[in-house]
């Protein structure tokens, strides 16, 4: 049993040495920055669609999190159907109705941070609106900028932590018990 424990400890020691950098021999993830901005647009009889786009060259991850759709001042008591045009998992464009708003029975709809990947187009399929769409534009960036000084410190830390673990030895039995 002691040999099995020693082998397990040696394996764990080897595993921690093979992982690069960081505290305890573990890889430290790149610093992540997350920014969040208000988003809003209005669809009406004059402006029947709106497209939310981001720059393709941007290395950041963009998410549009929708919070609410609501009829605003001047809306008639008619059905206002709003659809979202986006891409599915196969990168094919699909159109999905997300709201059917009517002033007398359902003037607003909470979407509880319904997340979409840009580009996204909102269309007023029926009705004259105005329909207000609100949410948050979230931008997540990972910084790969590591200074030379930080790299050297990580190498020194990993060298210090490469200490051989001594195997656990079984306790010696005492021969003469009364």
Swiss-Prot record:
GO biological process: chromatin remodeling; rRNA processing; rRNA transcription
Subcellular localization: Nucleus; Nucleus, Nucleolus
Gene Ontology terms for molecular function: chromatin binding; histone binding; RNA binding
Residue segments, region Disordered: 141-178
Residue positions, PTM N-acetylalanine: 2
Keywords: Acetylation, Chaperone, Methylation, Nucleus, Phosphoprotein
Taxonomy, superkingdom: Eukaryota
Subunit structure, as described in the record: Interacts with NPM (via N-terminus). Forms a pentamer with NPM at a ratio 4:1 (NPM3/NPM). Two pentamers form a decamer.
PANTHER family assigned to the protein according to its UniProt record, in alphabetical order: NUCLEOPLASMIN, NUCLEOPLASMIN-3
Similarity annotation: Belongs to the nucleoplasmin family.
Name of the molecule in the record: Nucleoplasmin-3
């Amino acid at each position: 049993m002691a040999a099995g424990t020693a082998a397990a400890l040696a394996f764990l020691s080897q595993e921690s040495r093979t992982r690069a950098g960081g505290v305890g021999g573990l890889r430290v993830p790149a610093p992540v920055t997350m920014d969040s901005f208000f988003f809003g647009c209005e669809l009406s009889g004059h402006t029947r669609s709106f497209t939310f786009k981001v720059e393709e060259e941007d290395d950041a991850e963009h998410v549009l999190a929708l919070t609410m759709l609501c009829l605003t001042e001047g809306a008639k008591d008619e059905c206002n159907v709003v659809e979202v045009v986006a891409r599915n998992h196969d990168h094919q464009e699909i159109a999905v109705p997300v709201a059917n708003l009517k002033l007398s029975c359902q003037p607003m709809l909470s979407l509880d941070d319904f997340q979409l990947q840009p580009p996204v187009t909102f269309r007023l399929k029926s009705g004259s609106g105005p329909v207000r769409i609100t949410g948050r534009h979230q931008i997540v960036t990972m910084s790969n900028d590591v200074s030379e000084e930080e790299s050297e410190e990580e190498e020194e830390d990993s060298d210090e932590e490469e200490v051989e673990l001594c195997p656990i030895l079984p306790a010696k039995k005492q021969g003469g018990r009364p």
